[in-house]
Amino acid sequence: MASSNTYSNFKLATELPAWSKLQKLYDAQGKSLNVKEEFQKDSARYNKYAKTLTNYDGSKILFDFSKNLINDEILATLIELAKEAKVTDLRDAMFAGEHINFTEDRAVYHVALRNRANKPMKVDGVDVAPEVDAVLQHMKEFSEQVRSGEWKGYTGKKITDVVNIGIGGSDLGPVMVTEALKHYAGVLDVHFVSNIDGTHIAEVLKVVDPETTLFLVASKTFTTAETITNANTAKNWFLSKTGNDQSNIAKHFAALSTNETEVAKFGIDTKNMFGFENWVGGRYSVWSAIGLSVALYIGFDNFEAFLKGAEAVDKHFVETPLEDNIPLLGGLLSVWYNNFFGAQTHLVAPFDQYLHRFPAYLQQLSMESNGKSVTRGNVFSTYSTGSILFGEPATNAQHSFFQLVHQGTKLIPSDFILAAQSHNPIENNLHQKMLASNFFAQAEALMVGKDEAQVKSEGATGGLVPHKIFSGNRPTTSILAQKITPAALGSLIAYYEHVTFTEGAIWNINSFDQWGVELGKVLAKVIGKELDNTEKITAHDASTNGLINQFKEWL
């Protein structure tokens, strides 16, 4: 139900008894805990801390938490913290459609988008499942028409290329998913335009044919400045190539939006408008109509498998006891490192080239959600919140920033992701086995390190010795899937969504607004008008004035 901030009575994390207990455990055990020694002391450690998720199709993903800086007492206290922070209460409120995004008075209901069991899911007393299903059915019909060639351009030719124009969640999700599931691609090529930099759309328009290109304009309000500017540029280009006949637009443009008036004004047939509700946040929107480019690219059946994979993790997150709840454990470990070890970053390194955009996607999910300094009690936090998430695919990353991870002065908790089965098992799986050997070796090396005696035994002497020492004891979580399928990818994304949720619930912040993006947009509108004339600018600080005036001189 709609309400004011009903979550302000949730306590600050530092007020919880388990928080103080964890601080004492960190001082007494955590900061000196040696994972290599923990394995020597406890032969069951791996079996205790490795958890397996079974997907809806029977496939599995293994999450190995055993190389983390925890023991049974620390883990039990972290779970105690989750209970005291009422993580499950907030989780249940989210799944019940309550307005847990209280600053915008909205439900947070992206989980309803992957409700393929079609169970009733209500917001403000209204079951949204039929509406979600209707949009999906519309997406299915449209995507199958385009993919089959039944849908034709204005000259009667089949569509060959799809250009998705969006930004933020309307871009990052579809870009990442289409790259990750490229193996499942069909007859269409997809392109993405997001940046207001004219180079982005110019380079795409160079390689597409107006007779065979479908543009998807992805903006819930149909007023997002960057998206509408790019969409108008695409429309002007299209009209200039097609005799300026406005009626041709309907065959080549569709809208992922809810603003019927603006969509119609643009020239798009509102029959080709795919909507989604305000309870779908941008960074959670790939499951919605925003995923139309994905459905066009990989086919609707694969898109539905993607949804079902996420649904399987939702079910696990809701039904599994805290001790075995995989996303909850991932979130608790993040809090442990952030707030007790002082770790500021979180590395996600997929050992899979198809997942090369996965870290960029997770950056928005994590940092836009939990980059907050005000709690649900409307006071500034006195403790650290969101981590700086970064990553690149390995093994490339090993030849760039892994030096810092292994021998730098900062603790960088890391997630490594690998699929056992490659979609491209070339050279009799030679490449895959080399990739896997690095996946296992990097996690092992970060844990065991190399001490002075080992370095000397290898022949190093004098001042060279300390340079070759690896301290080890650097935490990793290894995530091993059977194969990167649509279902597996859906599960991985949902895992990180619920990790992010758990972090925010512990920190007592609203993970579902993003006020931090607003100020820059407001100021940009003011400055944009100043760039339309030749007058010298003096209205800002000296630095901003100087930069604007130099730009105008050089433009």
Curated annotation (Swiss-Prot):
<dbReference type="InterPro" id="IPR018189">
    <property type="entry name" value="Phosphoglucose_isomerase_CS"/>
</dbReference>
<feature type="binding site">
    <location>
        <begin position="169"/>
        <end position="170"/>
    </location>
    <ligand>
        <name>D-glucose 6-phosphate</name>
    </ligand>
</feature>
<feature type="binding site">
    <location>
        <position position="521"/>
    </location>
    <ligand>
        <name>D-glucose 6-phosphate</name>
    </ligand>
</feature>
<feature type="binding site">
    <location>
        <position position="399"/>
    </location>
    <ligand>
        <name>D-glucose 6-phosphate</name>
    </ligand>
</feature>
<feature type="binding site">
    <location>
        <begin position="219"/>
        <end position="224"/>
    </location>
    <ligand>
        <name>D-glucose 6-phosphate</name>
    </ligand>
</feature>
<dbReference type="GO" id="GO:0009986">
    <property type="term" value="C:cell surface"/>
</dbReference>
<feature type="binding site">
    <location>
        <position position="368"/>
    </location>
    <ligand>
        <name>D-glucose 6-phosphate</name>
    </ligand>
</feature>
<dbReference type="InterPro" id="IPR046348">
    <property type="entry name" value="SIS_dom_sf"/>
</dbReference>
<feature type="active site">
    <location>
        <position position="521"/>
    </location>
</feature>
<comment type="similarity">
    <text>Belongs to the GPI family.</text>
</comment>
<dbReference type="GO" id="GO:0006096">
    <property type="term" value="P:glycolytic process"/>
</dbReference>
<dbReference type="Pfam" id="PF00342">
    <property type="entry name" value="PGI"/>
</dbReference>
<dbReference type="GO" id="GO:0005829">
    <property type="term" value="C:cytosol"/>
</dbReference>
<keyword id="KW-0413">Isomerase</keyword>
<keyword id="KW-0324">Glycolysis</keyword>
<protein>
    <recommendedName>
        <fullName>Glucose-6-phosphate isomerase</fullName>
        <ecNumber>5.3.1.9</ecNumber>
    </recommendedName>
</protein>
<feature type="binding site">
    <location>
        <position position="364"/>
    </location>
    <ligand>
        <name>D-glucose 6-phosphate</name>
    </ligand>
</feature>
<dbReference type="InterPro" id="IPR001672">
    <property type="entry name" value="G6P_Isomerase"/>
</dbReference>
<feature type="active site" description="Proton donor">
    <location>
        <position position="368"/>
    </location>
</feature>
<dbReference type="InterPro" id="IPR035482">
    <property type="entry name" value="SIS_PGI_2"/>
</dbReference>
<dbReference type="GO" id="GO:0006094">
    <property type="term" value="P:gluconeogenesis"/>
</dbReference>
<keyword id="KW-0312">Gluconeogenesis</keyword>
<comment type="function">
    <text>In the cytoplasm, catalyzes the conversion of glucose-6-phosphate to fructose-6-phosphate, the second step in glycolysis, and the reverse reaction during gluconeogenesis.</text>
</comment>
<dbReference type="GO" id="GO:0005739">
    <property type="term" value="C:mitochondrion"/>
</dbReference>
<dbReference type="GO" id="GO:0051156">
    <property type="term" value="P:glucose 6-phosphate metabolic process"/>
</dbReference>
<dbReference type="GO" id="GO:0004347">
    <property type="term" value="F:glucose-6-phosphate isomerase activity"/>
</dbReference>
<dbReference type="GO" id="GO:0048029">
    <property type="term" value="F:monosaccharide binding"/>
</dbReference>
<comment type="subunit">
    <text>Homodimer.</text>
</comment>
<feature type="active site">
    <location>
        <position position="399"/>
    </location>
</feature>
<dbReference type="GO" id="GO:0097367">
    <property type="term" value="F:carbohydrate derivative binding"/>
</dbReference>
<keyword id="KW-0963">Cytoplasm</keyword>
<dbReference type="InterPro" id="IPR023096">
    <property type="entry name" value="G6P_Isomerase_C"/>
</dbReference>
<dbReference type="InterPro" id="IPR035476">
    <property type="entry name" value="SIS_PGI_1"/>
</dbReference>
<comment type="pathway">
    <text>Carbohydrate degradation; glycolysis; D-glyceraldehyde 3-phosphate and glycerone phosphate from D-glucose: step 2/4.</text>
</comment>
